[in-house]
């Protein structure tokens, strides 16, 4: 596995692989890798000849009061895991390498109808930071496929829209959420949880499953289902619920009669830690 920290060395490797007619799979991450990330690497390995993983904690997607400075950076451990999982290259640029013009650089602005809701409502500017860095990474890596996790559901939908709108020649693949034995969705931020909070955390998924079962039983009063689930999560010990909603899985809009693919999305806080989760429902 090669470690690349500049755009020029990245492009040299890619050029060699392209000349040999090899396909490239790409997994963009912010590091602090866990089994969820590694499942993406495994899928990329199965679907492509060469696998590149990027590790870059992107300052553009963090707000002023968010956890950019304390976001876990575990590069040596990450590198060892990627080697074990047969990645071919890890791209780990500095902030200056990614953004030589600093804050003055060109931005990619995501569609407001998809970014003014859910995470976007809580984190203004977050998705413009995501689309900017991912568009730039796609341009640098030029992958055939990119594997992204389902846990950040809104992010996947926004990036899929970006790929379509900008006619980028990459296929996005959404990989299922990886959960621990309690049902908690794996996340780099789970390590912030205390032992007591960790025992409460899986109850968010339980609440989403109860909505799913009700929908499958024919209940279409989504607003009422989400209100009941919100009260349940709060009584289970969560400190706040930012949202629990049922949406069209493609457009992220309110479900319409006849929609076949729905997603139940949620964000809730335990102490200072925000947990995201979602459940897909195919009707």
Swiss-Prot record:
Main location: cytoplasm
Localization: Cytoplasm
Sorted UniProt keywords: ATP-binding, Cytoplasm, Ligase, Nucleotide-binding, Pantothenate biosynthesis
One Gene Ontology CC term in the entry: cytosol
CDD domains for the chain: PanC
Reaction(s) the record says it catalyses: (R)-pantoate + beta-alanine + ATP = (R)-pantothenate + AMP + diphosphate + H(+)
Parts of the chain that traverse the membrane: none
Family annotation (InterPro entries): Cyt_trans-like, Pantoate_ligase, Pantoate_ligase_C, Rossmann-like_a/b/a_fold
Ligand binding (ATP): 30-37, 149-152, 178, 186-189
Residues the entry annotates as binding beta-alanine: 61
Residues involved in (R)-pantoate binding: 61, 155
Active site annotation, chain numbering: 37 (proton donor)
Pathway(s) of this molecule: Cofactor biosynthesis; (R)-pantothenate biosynthesis; (R)-pantothenate from (R)-pantoate and beta-alanine: step 1/1
Listed Gene3D superfamilies: HUPs, Pantoate-beta-alanine ligase, C-terminal domain
Superkingdom of this protein's organism: Bacteria
GO-annotated biological processes: pantothenate biosynthetic process
Family matches, as Pfam families: Pantoate_ligase
UniProt EC number: 6.3.2.1
Molecular function in Gene Ontology: ATP binding; pantoate-beta-alanine ligase activity
The keyword Glycosyltransferase appears for this protein: no
Quaternary state and interactors: Homodimer.
Matches recorded under NCBIfam families: cyt_tran_rel, panC
Family of this protein: Belongs to the pantothenate synthetase family.
Note: The reaction proceeds by a bi uni uni bi ping pong mechanism.
Biological role stated in the UniProt entry: Catalyzes the condensation of pantoate with beta-alanine in an ATP-dependent reaction via a pantoyl-adenylate intermediate.
Name of the protein: Pantothenate synthetase
UniProt lineage: Bacteria, Pseudomonadati, Pseudomonadota, Gammaproteobacteria, Thiotrichales
């Amino acid at each position: 596995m090669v470690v690349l920290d500049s755009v020029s060395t990245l492009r040299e490797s890619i050029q060699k692989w392209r000349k040999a007619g090899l396909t490239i799979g790409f997994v963009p991450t912010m590091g602090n890798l866990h089994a969820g990330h590694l499942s993406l690497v495994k899928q990329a390995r199965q679907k492509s000849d060469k696998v590149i993983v990027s590790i870059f904690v992107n300052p553009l997607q963090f707000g002023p009061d968010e956890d950019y400075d304390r976001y876990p950076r575990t590069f040596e451990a990450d590198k060892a895991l990627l080697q074990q999982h047969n990645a071919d290259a890890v791209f780990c640029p500095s902030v200056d390498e990614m953004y030589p013009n600093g804050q003055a650089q060109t931005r990619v602005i995501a569609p407001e109808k998809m970014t003014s809701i859910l995470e976007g409502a809580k984190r203004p500017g977050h998705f413009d930071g995501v689309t900017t860095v991912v568009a730039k990474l796609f341009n640098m890596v030029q992958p055939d496929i990119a594997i992204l996790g389902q846990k950040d559901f809104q992010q996947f939908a926004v990036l899929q829209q970006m790929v379509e709108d900008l006619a980028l020649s990459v296929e996005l693949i959404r990989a299922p959420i990886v959960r621990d034995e309690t049902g908690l969705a794996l996340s780099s931020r789970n390590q912030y949880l205390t032992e007591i909070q960790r025992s409460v955390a899986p109850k968010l998924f339980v609440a989403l499953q109860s909505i799913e079962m009700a929908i499958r039983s024919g209940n279409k009063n989504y607003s009422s289902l989400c209100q009941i689930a919100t009260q349940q999560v709060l009584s289970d010990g969560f400190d706040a619920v930012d949202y629990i909603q049922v949406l069209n899985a493609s457009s992220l809009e309110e479900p319409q009669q006849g929609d076949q693919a729905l997603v139940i999305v949620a964000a809730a806080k335990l102490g200072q830690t925000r947990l995201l989760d979602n459940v897909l429902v195919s009707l």
